[in-house]
Structure formats: structure tokens, C-alpha cells
Amino acid sequence: MTNPHGASAPAAAPRIDLHAHSTASDGTASPTQFAETAALAGLNVVALTDHDTVDGVAEAVAAAAPLGVRVVPGVELSVMDGRDEVHLLGLHLAHIEAIAAALVTFQQGRRERAEAMV
């Protein structure tokens, strides 16, 4: 579309959600359903940021690609800042397999700390 001065109208801004969960943590949709829901909502880019796991990322990426949705690999880490728990988002993750292995150790340490508190 052009305006009266002959210039093209700007392209529509992409629709993006950079913080969402699947059943790999506390979400209600499987990674495949997450991708399908994003497409139905008209989102162009979504980040799957499950709590302390990247287990659903590969499934979401594979399901989203044919739907025209880009999945940004991510994770939401629960970390301690003194006595306060803070949620830290990691986005555009590379080396998912190495991160997944590190998160297993991370999750085990968190479980051990929780058991020690009880």
C-alpha cells in the first residue's frame, strides 16, 4: 500500500512473545500444541522458556517451522539472589544438548536444597 506521497506503508510489526511455558515445566500445552497455539494467535516469533529445562525446545521448533512461526530456544532459570528467588530468562540458546545436561545437574542441586529445608 502507498500513501498519497507515493511512499510505501511500513510493514506490519511482527507479533512476538518471548516468555511462554509448555508441559515440559508448568505450562498446559505440549510443545507441539504451544507452536500451534502461537500460529493460531498470529504470532511470528515465540520463545519457549520452560522452568529449568530445555526438554521441549526441539519439539516446538519442529512443530512451528511448517506453521511459519519462529521458536527462539530459551529457558527460565530459578536462581537465588541472597535469600530471594529470581527468575532469569535465557534466550537464543545454542548448544541445547550441553545446556540440557547442565540443567539436569542444576535441577538435582535444587531438589537437594529443597529436601534439606524440609
Ranges and model annotations:
Residues 115-118:
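Extended, charge-rich helix/loop segments that form flexible
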Residues 1-84:
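An N-terminally biased module of ancient metal coordination in phosphate/nucleic-acid-related enzymes
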